[in-house]
Amino acid sequence: MTNFEKFLDKNSVFKNISVLSPHYIPKILPYREKQIEEIMSYIAPTLKNQKSRNILIYGKTGTGKTCSVKKIMEEFEKIQSNARMHYLNCRVYNSKYRVLQKVMKDYWPELEKAGFGLPFIYEKLLETLKQQRYLIVVLDEIDMVKDLDDLIYTLTRANDESGTGGLSIMGISNKLSFKENLDPRSKSSLNEVEIVFQPYTTEQLQKILEQRVEEGFQPNAVKQSAVNLAAALTAQENGDARYALKLLMRAGEIADEKKKNFVDDSDVEEARKRVETDIIAETINTLPEMHKITLHAIAKLSLNGSKYARLDGMAEGFLMSGEVYEEYERCCRQLRKKPRSLRWYKEYLNDLEMLGLVITTPSSKGIRGQTTLIKLGHEPEIVYKITNTSFFC
């Protein structure tokens, strides 16, 4: 009979693999002390029963935004006060209703049950603020909220209506331009402070990896050249620390598979191929269903080739928006799902582009009529394999 002993006794280059997880928050966040101090200075008044400024935090994926905010939340919660920070991932809580319900459930447990309307939940928010409570609502990937203008207006209006207490918004976004899509009323009501997280340099990534190697690997288990290579490869891409950590973790797993007691450059090179597919799969598998069907349609057409490929002005690999929508409708019928309207389809494309899964561009003058051209952001074979497995496994 198989038991766990052989796995527990197995030699490994790892000492504590969880240290390499993107969810792990180290005691010290290198190269983010300045941003952490700045954010803390803006929200400190909340701990003295004063409303703090709204904050928008920008930066590419893997620049330490979420990790820094969670570190701040740890420190915030150590101080006894009427203030609380509420963290929400807007890929999950992607509407005004979901955001308000999630925040208010912490004060009014009965809201856990379905069936409460938005006006009732809003009244509970006002009641909470009137109890001299101070809230900071952290909206990670704030761009993913469908009715963001309504949400911002509602949250800022609550301050005026309650008369006491205070609610502040802390938005986190990968897109510096996301505010351009807000209506003037929302922009005006925010009155926010903006903080930017720059991508890590090669040298900074080296130091971050060295810190995690010390905590997560056995002594002398990772060659310095492997750390340097992982940092250099990551800096070439986009300075994403999460990518660098995943690269190192995969390299360690490969070394274990080979029964080696150290990680070298060859393991990092092999890990690079696996990690790229892993990251694409993670992003795709967390997509809402209709987004995933849209992406599946694009991948399928990309493999089969556009029927308009021979048109003048049609760049290689690009598809016309209309043919993608037709394929999306076919995929929906095949899956026995009701296709959404063109308006919703365009929203899906915008979201997929924001995640780097597709590239869109207006058509050139050589193509009759004005349309949007669409291209996958990754290899069609990889994307199709992931989406096809998701729907037809």
Protein language model features and the residues they cover:
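Terminal-proximal interaction/regulatory segments of ATP-powered molecular machines
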Residues: 306-393
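Short alpha-helical segments that sit at the start of domains
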Residues: 277-315
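Mid-core helix/loop region of P-loop NTP-binding domains shared across ATPases and GTPases
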Residues: 4, 8-14, 21, 52, ...
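A short, basic N-terminal segment
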Residues: 1-52, 75
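Conserved beta-strand position immediately N-terminal to the Walker
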Residues: 55
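A short hydrophobic beta-strand->loop->alpha-helix junction that borders the nucleotide-binding pocket
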Residues: 58, 85-94
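P-loop NTPase Walker A phosphate-binding motif
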Residues: 58-83
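Conserved C-terminal helix/linker of AAA+ ATPases
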Residues: 254-280
